């Protein structure tokens, strides 16, 4: 045979484990019974009793397979005993568990519907020496030390009892194999025999000097007569039908042996109690514990060595270790297992068909793997290698065949799952939600205030093996407010030792096992009021179990001990925040590492923010809002906003700069941060996230508030802009800043706040006035200069950034290629929040937004970034990890700047990945820096501007909507990506629609799509990548319309799209210099959001400054929206041939975006059209890049048309075509269509998609050429209907003809919004698809803008929407708006979009899109008119609810995809039921909660409970939670709840 202790961390409880008992799994139904019994014993349950009076029931498995599913709950801590549990005994036939404590209390537990409850209670006040079930499980033998013995039935009826008068105590009692007699052992070496009816049969003296420690038979513990041992049982050991159930083995062939162990360590093997010549085993061990395996052929004897005394002088303690010896039925020694255990082994038991031997020593539990046969060489090698490796992860380093590696890894698969999967990395365990349905059952205990520590401390323990494993510690840091810091519970021990072997010694030595911190948790005490106790009313001793009795004096001591427990370290490094600095922490070096999160509150304790302090955690971990009745007579209403926390690469982790002091006191709307709250460049993280913005779902919140709330929640995504940009951001930012200034001097020039967000922002105004290109030209001049001047420089920057970000040879080679990082766009979106209040938008990143718009001139060659190039583009390098987190700046309801971090999504990746290879590319990047600069000043101006007419969004939120839209787009992260991909796919699917949409976007914005055409000029490198995020900016379109229906809203819009995303970044200066592209992109979005006109202006300006328009191929960061196609479920939407095309960058072709001076090409907004069909792609593309900034007329708008039909997917890709066509397209800058652009914000596809996508040349027809476009002037009514029609029906047909014939003609399809997207409907089908796609896209991205503007347009059909659209707000593409508008649009369109959505897994853009990220976009939408759409779909009761629905949807469908980075779950507590009898509100906690309290609550998500909290003692609570809660988040919510001024 062979035996070895299992590898892996030592399993520990918080107190000494005193007894063990194991049982196999029970078949769940009759159908399972015929299955081989062996399977039943691969899984089982281990019962443990400990010194804290808690019984642990823990799941075990021996199959060594990780793929096997485990029960949702693998550990139960059963409380109820008043003193240490000394005996646990399973009754396998009846599936009951008997437990006895030191005071004589006996509980019989039974499990029903997943919960354990006490069935029987017996307490006669005397110590129980033994409790044994008969072999058939029908009777129980109870023996007391005072000589009283009792036999009762399994149901609790007493059969007989007797008082045995002895001078010594009874130490043990057992049944004979036939259950006809009972034997008792005494402390004076005697054996007393009685029959099953209580008649005395004999007294036998076995040993004169040694007392009997224990007795047992080498016979199965239970005999179960069931059909499980049927002929179908293939088990080798299958016993006869009446064989032992536990381990069916032909035991009957072996004559039963009575085994008696004595205090001396000797063991006698007897045929019967009267055997005169027993076989004596002299083990040489002290404190012996012996047990036969169930098969009856192997006796395990565990004890401490005696011979160690020889070496005791020098190092006796080291030699003194426990060992296990194995003997056969003849008493022959077979094997000795030496262990490193240096404490006595208190209890052992066999399990899993004798393949495991479980040993308890102190608080530690050891699992020994036993091989009964001669061990194979393979097994010996496995154990030798495993003991050398020590860790499972090292197996992969060996050069072994896969089968051997797999076999070797089984040595590391634990029989009992450890509480923390990786003891060396507990941070991950507490920071991220558990996978699947795994639920963590914890206990939270308050420890007394300690002067050293400061305020009261709470420790969160994970229930395990009947004990508590500390995983988090919280300390109150303010006497005025319920504010806490959450930290690691570690003390001086090394992190890896916390739960390792050192834990045992520390717990044992420091806590002496009896005072470990848990017990005070009052696990024992909690049960004091347990119903089981009350049921024991018939027991005379019941009062002893009363609560008073349970309040043992140990409690305070234990509490103190707890605070000293090595596992509850006292050291608390200071985080550096003023509130924390007052405390002194000895371990300054660990300071940053020890604080994980902070819970901040308003003065009233009704709103809480959970802020991540650790570098690896998102800054925003959630928020809790309480709403109570005036008199506190009704249960409180809790609303929890919980951002999903996903693990991200450390590369993208940024230390969040969170100001815990920033908390809006009572004002819900007042964020603490001011306009400057959004740092210009580097300090993106400094922005505070006000708590006030968060509102309970039950409360009405302004759109702004909603947005702020969502965004702040999104903050959970962590991080900072810098994260997004990474190092490159810093550099790029700096460089860009310089460039920006240069590039966007106009911004400064147009100091006019609304006007100049980006140097060209003024453009909007200009455009408004002069729809013609003329306006654009002026900015163009400066812009061009910028472009030109920066063209090289930017080019360099971009190149640099491209190289840095996406080390792609292509980019480097292209040198000029501008790399617009989608991520920046995303960040921009953050900034965009400014929405509602113009002033509010402090430095809204709007100014930053512009960069993307103009991709500086890039060589026409670049324009066509081929798929390959695009792939290059995906500067995923920057944040290739998608991400870590991106910091989003938003404005809360009061207009304060709020910064939130959200995990970057792949989308992000794609965004920043897009780099324009063109030489002029850098120009775009340049923009970024400028954007940053300009944005701030302009931001607010822009905001004002936007707020005014620009965004006619229904609510005052419009400004934010754009931001939000961009944010949403990015916040949507995956969702947005989905959107984009959706759009993409949609386009693919419905090339027509997509084309239309693209065209619309392109057209609306101005045929900027011409950008591609622009490539004609050599710099046509228009093929800039449109920022994926920029699409969100599209909503700025509304701003354009806001400028005036007739004014060139288009231009503004266009800029908006692109700028919006960038803006937010600029605000934060997210872009690292290397990531200049990125910077520009984000900034652009933001800025655009803030001021579309400005943004556009900026963008246009830049191109103007740079090379001539034609030359300046705007390197729009073409959102890699299409990239997501593959990544997002949405791809599904257009999984048709179109889908493939979608991936083509055709839509992206827009890159050359010619932005008229006035028109900012908002790449972000441009919907990407996948190159579905050649012709349509072009159109699609256009829509995709609705920006079509009217570059000086030269931008190849016209060419696009030409190109469009032909290249559609691929030609569009080739910027050259567009470039060639550059002439006509000149998008008439002021043309409202530019707005249209905005309306169609493209989603950001995954970087891969992006790269594959090319910017399809948008048919940038001279705006004049579009009759449809002009209608855009009044997008609200006219255009919308027209586009509607086009999109909806003719979408393909009429426009197709138009577009197709025109190719230049852009049919403005205001699919989702009233963006007049110029769709080259070269391919009538394409347009339709485009439209659908665009719709969807818009829905998401544009919904905000669309809600307003699109609404209006659709309102063309729907008047109400028209109201918002009046300003071309429709162009603002806010996802919600878009959705609403879409809905309004026409049922037909709606149906289409729905179908599309289905394809994409989105039911309805607005509803199906699970914008889990609830980027401000959704919130905004919700707050705004889009809220109607949202509500109409889900009729959420409040914005919070809307978010919730969104989150829910996303979570449901994303499967972690959409929600992976930034979904915000909105949950509420379950309303308790009123109990008339007791006059209290009650909840069903499944027996886990033993005291009624107003603080008890349960949280539900989608109808299933995901968290529950309840009191079990005066200072102890239970806390159970599962996904989406991480331990840190759940603990923070519990701390917030505990401080409520309620009973």
Curated annotation (Swiss-Prot):
Species in which this protein is naturally found: Homo sapiens
Listed Basic and acidic residues bias regions: 1329-1347, 1443-1453
Tissues in which the UniProt entry reports expression: Expressed mainly in the brain, skeletal muscle, testis and kidney.
InterPro entries membership: Beta-prop_WDR35_TULP_N (IPR056159), SOCS_box (IPR001496), Tubby-like_C (IPR025659), Tubby_C (IPR000007), Tumour_necrosis_fac-like_dom (IPR008983), WD40/YVTN_repeat-like_dom_sf (IPR015943), WD40_repeat_dom_sf (IPR036322), WD40_rpt (IPR001680)
The keyword Phosphoprotein belongs to this UniProt entry's keyword annotation: yes
Main location, first listed in the record: cytoplasm
Pfam families given in the database record: Beta-prop_WDR35_TULP_N, SOCS_box, Tub
Name listed for the protein in its UniProt record: Tubby-related protein 4
A GO cellular component annotation in the UniProt record: cytoplasm
Modified residues (Phosphoserine): 577, 1343, 1374
Residue ranges annotated for the SOCS box domain, each copy included: 364-414
Region (Disordered): 530-577, 829-850, 1004-1058, 1326-1355, 1367-1453
Repeat (WD) residue spans along the chain: 6-72, 73-115, 116-158, 159-237, 238-276, 277-334, 335-372
Pathway: Protein modification; protein ubiquitination
Compartments, as annotated in UniProt: Cytoplasm
GO biological process, one term: protein ubiquitination
Listed Polar residues bias regions: 1036-1050
This protein's encoding gene: TULP4
Superkingdom as given in the UniProt entry: Eukaryota
Keyword Repeat: yes
Positions in coiled-coil regions: none
Function of the protein: May be a substrate-recognition component of a SCF-like ECS (Elongin-Cullin-SOCS-box protein) E3 ubiquitin ligase complex which mediates the ubiquitination and subsequent proteasomal degradation of target proteins.
Modified residue annotations for Asymmetric dimethylarginine: 945, 950
Keywords of the record: Cytoplasm, Methylation, Phosphoprotein, Repeat, Ubl conjugation pathway, WD repeat
